[in-house]
């Protein structure tokens, strides 16, 4: 596993958080997790991930703040925003997440190939 490609997953739903972790580990990446935005931002400050995947709608600090703060602290780190609300008329829209600084916005539910493909596109495949 490539220790140099560490993905931080910030997701309040434990089932989806575990699923994303499993997908990214199976793809060969190292994965860290946080259950809400404030903890995710603190983790990003301490460990400088290669890429951040964040839910937009979470209790406490939401994904919009995560995108802005990660971009402020580490301008080169890509962020993938995820949300079920991207498919509805409620909350942040995908283009708004991109305008905040997200590199990609994926609507839930998404497929494994879409998430892993976006990670590979943004940071490259893990080293063999």
State where each predicted segment sits.
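Non-catalytic signal-transmission and effector/linker regions of two-component phosphorelay proteins
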Residues: 1-8, 113-128
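Conserved acidic carboxylate
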Residues: 11
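The feature encodes the CheY-like receiver
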Residues: 17, 59
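Charged docking surfaces used in two-component/phosphorelay signaling
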Residues: 18-26
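Acidic, metal-coordinating helix/loop segments flanking the phosphotransfer/catalytic sites
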Residues: 33-51, 93
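Acidic catalytic/metal-coordinating carboxylates
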Residues: 36-39, 61-66
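Active-site residues of response regulator receiver
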Residues: 55
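Alpha4 helix (beta4-alpha4-beta5 surface) of REC/receiver domains from two-component response regulators
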Residues: 65, 86-106, 113, 117
């Amino acid at each position: 596993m490539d220790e140099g490609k560490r993905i931080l997953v910030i997701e309040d739903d434990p089932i989806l958080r575990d699923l994303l972790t499993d997908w990214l580990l199976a793809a060969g990446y190292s994965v860290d997790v946080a259950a809400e935005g404030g903890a995710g931002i603190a983790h990003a400050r301490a460990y400088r991930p290669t890429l951040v995947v964040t839910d937009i709608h979470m209790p406490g600090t939401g994904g919009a703040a995560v995108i802005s703060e990660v971009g402020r602290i580490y301008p080169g780190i890509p962020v993938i925003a995820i949300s079920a609300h991207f498919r509805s008329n409620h909350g942040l829209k995908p283009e708004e997440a991109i305008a905040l600084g997200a590199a990609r916005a994926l609507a839930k539910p998404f497929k494994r190939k879409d998430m892993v493909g976006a990670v590979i596109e943004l940071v490259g495949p893990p080293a063999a």
